[in-house]
């Protein structure tokens, strides 16, 4: 769904791939790869895209059909990690359970929860399958405008 929404939002904004490429500092081919699913968009590029066009991450990932207007995302790995940990605890899951379900090492998942690394798009896609309801915007502590 993310790939489809990237293309849909670009087209709604009446922008060409080369214009998105210029904004994100990448090649046209890379933008095309993101939109077709050939390449996975890195989280930082996705955040830049969402911030540039005031897009909800929940909307981009297909968790909602409504694009709410949010404050820009400010990357705070520790806060994201704390929110991940809280989400897991509320749902009575272990790190091992979550890591196994999304097919990553427990240590890698632990690093996300401890704020050592920015969570990846691939990991977020996995979390969407585990948690319902789930909000990526909430995970990133985004505030509605």
Language-model regions, residue ranges each:
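DNA major-groove recognition helix of helix-turn-helix/homeodomain DNA-binding modules
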Residues: 25, 44-59, 122-138
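A short, Lys/Arg-rich alpha-helix, primarily the initiator
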Residues: 1-12, 68-90
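Alpha-helical residues within the helix-turn-helix
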Residues: 11, 22, 51, 89, ...
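DNA major-groove recognition helix of helix-turn-helix
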Residues: 35, 45, 61-64, 113, ...
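Short alpha-helical DNA-recognition segment
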Residues: 15-33, 92-110
């Amino acid at each position: 769904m993310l790939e489809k929404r990237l293309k849909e939002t670009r087209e709604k904004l009446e922008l060409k791939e080369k214009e998105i490429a210029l904004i994100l500092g990448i090649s046209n081919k890379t933008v095309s790869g993101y939109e077709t699913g050939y390449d996975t968009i890195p989280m930082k590029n996705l955040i830049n895209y969402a911030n540039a066009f005031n897009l909800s991450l929940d909307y981009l990932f297909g968790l909602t059909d409504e694009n709410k207007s949010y404050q820009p995302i400010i990357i705070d790995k520790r806060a994201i990690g704390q929110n991940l940990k809280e989400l897991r605890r509320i749902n009575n899951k272990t790190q091992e359970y979550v890591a196994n379900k999304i097919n990553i090492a427990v240590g890698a998942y632990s690093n996300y929860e401890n704020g050592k690394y920015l969570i990846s798009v691939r990991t977020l896609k996995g979390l969407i399958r585990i948690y319902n309801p789930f909000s990526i915007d909430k995970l990133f502590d985004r505030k509605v405008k």
